[in-house]
């Protein structure tokens, strides 16, 4: 395949045109008065969004050289989105500002490698300043503010705050379609897994077709139970206590199942048999989770624990166990809290190490079940287009809120990046030559987000910046929605520190790469075949 090449100045200018195409489409969405972008879809209704990464991902330019620049900006947006779940528009605006200023200086003769070094030093100082300004989330109100700003809706902010309050820091919150036009939160307390009773004869509430036992013993094993003999000793011990017994096993069949059903029907022993959740290694891990949560052990031949040798102390306990046809919920497990915390920490470590998205999701789900619950935000809307857009905003706001819990919050509205200039200015004064130019590029770029927010809201950015910097309070800023100067923390205009930090780091990373680019290589497009169709022969 033949290639086309461009070098030095010509190459950088082509990249810049590509960067501008994406950034100009994305930056109009920034701030409380940002506009929407309508994206055509090859099938289904068009998407209406103000999410930077969604817009960037859809842009593909005809000119192959310019398209390389567009792809680099997409990388900024998606990297920021992956790490922090928000801040994609801010990252794009910063990248565009750094690239514009950088290309100007490199064209004037600055050494790109030294410029890159200066950029890196300035960004490191900026990141440190962001960390200093940040403060921990102190209330549900703070969480609601972070979510409201990300989703651009107070109603969504309140829903996310409610969900987070219920499931805690390690809990799982999922987003699903609602069957009505209402948007609300559903909460499942305790550990829930999608396996139900082996036989409907175990049902205690025929109306709801479910089994409900209070204060039951829980026998956990990874074996298939078909013979009743190994179970007899422990069944007798449980029967003497008068408490119910929940058996979680790989499967229960044959003689074992018949005996358990007969005991239940006669009233000798209230019991229910449930299939173990998951498959393979995942099943073993989930059984171990249930054992730790309920304070029991897993009876497994692998570790030499036989069913015949089990005592009441080896069985798990819980306040309530509910079993339906396809789901089981264990509420109020009697496990040791320290052991549960250790298990959660272990799963957290696994999440950090894994690279597979699917693996990450299943581990987070397990962690949430141990931590005490799952919340589902059911999203409702009048049309499919509105539903897609609303769902997307909620998912974004969730990611931003988690980022805020992790690294704290900073004043929003571009104020934190503006304040970080003070630290960057020190670096500019310490450096000289082309490194100084690199640091100066970052210094100038840090005003781009607040400028754009002001512009989108119809204000003059220069006047706002001057007025904000007159006040030394790092939380003092400009509310673009109401057109007032205020304390950003008190007004609830806040961003997660992680989002602001990631936006700056990713923008600088791509800008540095682009400035040090000296050649572009792309594939030559195939010539279109314009030859006329041959005439059909006459017969």
Swiss-Prot record:
Coiled coil: none annotated. One of its GO terms (cellular component) is cytoplasm. Its main location: cytoplasm. ATP binds at residues 29-32, 86-90, 413, 479-481, 495. Its EC number is 5.6.1.7. GO terms for molecular function: ATP binding; ATP-dependent protein folding chaperone; isomerase activity; unfolded protein binding. Keywords: ATP-binding, Chaperone, Cytoplasm, Isomerase, Nucleotide-binding. InterPro entries: Chaperonin_Cpn60_CS (IPR018370), Cpn60/GroEL (IPR001844), Cpn60/GroEL/TCP-1 (IPR002423), GroEL-like_apical_dom_sf (IPR027409), GROEL-like_equatorial_sf (IPR027413), TCP-1-like_intermed_sf (IPR027410). It comes from Thermosipho africanus (strain TCF52B). It catalyses: ATP + H2O + a folded polypeptide = ADP + phosphate + an unfolded polypeptide. GO terms for biological process: protein refolding. It comes from the Bacteria. It is found in: Cytoplasm. The gene is groEL. Forms a cylinder of 14 subunits composed of two heptameric rings stacked back-to-back. Interacts with the co-chaperonin GroES. It holds the Pfam family Cpn60_TCP1. NCBIfam families: GroEL, PRK00013.1, PRK12849.1, PRK12850.1, PRK12851.1. Together with its co-chaperonin GroES, plays an essential role in assisting protein folding. The GroEL-GroES system forms a nano-cage that allows encapsulation of the non-native substrate proteins and provides a physical environment optimized to promote and accelerate protein folding. HAMAP family: CH60 (MF_00600). This is Chaperonin GroEL.
């Amino acid at each position: 395949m033949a290639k086309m090449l461009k070098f030095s100045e010509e190459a950088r200018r082509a990249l810049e045109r590509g960067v501008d195409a994406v950034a100009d489409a994305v930056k109009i969405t920034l701030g409380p008065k940002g506009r929407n972008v309508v994206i055509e879809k090859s099938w289904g209704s068009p998407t209406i969004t103000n999410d930077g990464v969604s817009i960037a991902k859809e842009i593909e330019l005809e000119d192959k050289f310019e398209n390389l620049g567009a792809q680099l900006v997409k990388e900024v947006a998606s990297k920021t989105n992956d790490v922090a779940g928000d801040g994609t528009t801010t990252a794009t605006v910063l990248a565009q500002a750094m690239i514009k200023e950088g290309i100007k200086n490199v064209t004037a003769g600055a050494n790109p490698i030294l410029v890159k070094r200066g950029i890196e030093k300035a960004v490191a100082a900026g990141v440190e300043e962001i960390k200093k300004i940040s403060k921990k989330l102190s209330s549900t109100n703070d969480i609601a503010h972070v979510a409201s700003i990300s989703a651009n809706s107070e109603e969504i902010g309140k829903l996310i705050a409610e969900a987070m309050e219920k499931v805690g820091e390690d809990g799982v919150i999922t987003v699903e379609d609602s069957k009505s036009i209402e948007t609300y939160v559903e909460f499942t307390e305790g550990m829930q897994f999608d396996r139900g009773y082996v036989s409907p004869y175990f049902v205690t509430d025929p109306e709801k077709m479910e089994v409900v036992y209070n204060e039951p013993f829980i026998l956990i094993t990874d074996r298939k139970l078909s013979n009743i003999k190994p179970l007899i000793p422990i069944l007798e011990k449980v029967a003497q206590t008068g408490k119910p017994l929940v058996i979680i096993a790989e499967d229960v069949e044959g003689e074992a199942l018949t005996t358990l059903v007969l005991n239940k029907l006669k009233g000798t022993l209230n019991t229910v048999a449930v299939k173990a959740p998951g498959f393979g290694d995942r099943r073993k891990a989930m059984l171990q989770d249930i054992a730790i949560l309920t304070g029991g052990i897993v009876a497994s031949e692998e570790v030499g624990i036989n069913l015949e040798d089990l005592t009441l102390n080896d069985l798990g306990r819980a306040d309530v166990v509910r079993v339906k046809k396809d789901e089981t919920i264990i509420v109020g497990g009697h496990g040791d809290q320290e052991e549960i915390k250790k298990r959660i920490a272990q799963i957290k470590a696994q999440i950090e190490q894994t690279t597979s998205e699917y693996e990450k999701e299943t581990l987070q789900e397990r962690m949430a079940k141990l931590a005490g619950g799952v919340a589902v935000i059911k999203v409702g809307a009048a049309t499919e287009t509105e539903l897609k857009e609303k769902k997307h905003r909620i998912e974004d706001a969730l990611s931003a809120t988690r980022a805020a819990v992790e690294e704290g919050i900073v004043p929003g509205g571009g104020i934190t990046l503006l304040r970080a200039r003070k630290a960057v200015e020190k670096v500019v004064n310490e450096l000289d030559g082309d490194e100084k130019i690199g640091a100066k590029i970052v210094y100038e770029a840090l005003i781009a987000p607040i400028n754009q927010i002001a512009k989108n809201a119809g204000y003059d950015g220069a006047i706002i910046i001057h007025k904000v910097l007159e006040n030394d309070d790092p939380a003092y800023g400009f509310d673009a929605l109401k057109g007032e100067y205020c304390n950003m923390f008190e007004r609830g205009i806040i961003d997660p520190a992680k989002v602001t930090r990631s936006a700056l780091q990713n923008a600088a990373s791509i800008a540095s790469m682009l400035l040090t680019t000296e050649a572009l290589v792309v594939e030559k497009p195939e010539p279109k075949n314009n030859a006329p169709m041959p005439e059909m022969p006459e017969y």
